[in-house]
Swiss-Prot record:
UniProt subunit comment: Component of the ATP synthase complex composed at least of ATP5F1A/subunit alpha, ATP5F1B/subunit beta, ATP5MC1/subunit c (homooctomer), MT-ATP6/subunit a, MT-ATP8/subunit 8, ATP5ME/subunit e, ATP5MF/subunit f, ATP5MG/subunit g, ATP5MK/subunit k, ATP5MJ/subunit j, ATP5F1C/subunit gamma, ATP5F1D/subunit delta, ATP5F1E/subunit epsilon, ATP5PF/subunit F6, ATP5PB/subunit b, ATP5PD/subunit d, ATP5PO/subunit OSCP.
Record has DNA repair as a keyword: no
Similarity comment: family membership: Belongs to the ATPase protein 8 family.
Transmembrane segments: 9-29
Pfam families in alphabetical order: ATP-synt_8 (PF00895)
One Gene Ontology MF term: proton transmembrane transporter activity
Domain of life: Eukaryota
Protein name: ATP synthase F(0) complex subunit 8
Role description: Subunit 8, of the mitochondrial membrane ATP synthase complex (F(1)F(0) ATP synthase or Complex V) that produces ATP from ADP in the presence of a proton gradient across the membrane which is generated by electron transport complexes of the respiratory chain. ATP synthase complex consist of a soluble F(1) head domain - the catalytic core - and a membrane F(1) domain - the membrane proton channel. These two domains are linked by a central stalk rotating inside the F(1) region and a stationary peripheral stalk.
GO cellular component, one term: mitochondrial membrane
């Protein structure tokens, strides 16, 4: 059963995890956002609710 022979696929799996864990996180974390998020105001809006005529 050739799928049980780990020599062809084990090195590929280890190398791909090496790429994922070593190279990709610094590249992803280096991205910057163009706009910093601002805090929303904590004021409550003074709007009246609209009653629906159910007749």
């Amino acid at each position: 059963m050739p799928q049980l022979n780990p020599s062809p696929w084990f090195a590929i799996m280890v190398f791909s995890w090496f790429v994922f864990l070593i190279f990709l996180p610094p590249k992803i974390m280096a991205h910057t956002f163009p706009n910093e998020p601002t805090a929303q105001s904590t004021q409550t809006l003074k709007t009246k609710s609209w009653t629906w005529p159910w007749h």
